[in-house]
Amino acid sequence: MDEERDGVTVRLLTLADAPRLVRMDQAITGRNRTAWYEGKLKRALEESDLQISLGAQVDGFLVGAVLGSLHYGEFGQPEPIAILDTILVDPGFARRGIGSALLENLTRNLRALGIERLRTEVSWDEHDLGRFLGFQGFVPAPRLVLELRLGALPA
């Protein structure tokens, strides 16, 4: 499945990629989310019939990734939808087309599977990510995300 273009090779992720994903994420967020990445990769690779998570390499070095999943019928949606959970690009490789290459491959793969929509969420203050996704064709979805804070219950 490896596909090379403009010096970027896009391939399927493996469990061995987890430590590198954690380091990239930590460089971006300042947090260590080892358990999250290990769990996410394990579910994507071992518990799913279809793997849609991809990695991008430059000179054999993993410099970016997209992690996602397919959902069938959640939240009253009759058709399948792909969810983009994470897009990572090593800060040292930012603005070199890594994210674009990953999304281009991901969307092509999803279309081949008959998936018509890819959805993600962006924090309101992640302006760079929002602009990047807008440039890639993402638009606000006709959905309202609701949240209930589960702090201490009143007595």
Show which residues each predicted segment covers.
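Conserved acetyl-CoA-binding loop-helix of GNAT-fold acetyltransferases
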Residues: 89, 95-108, 135
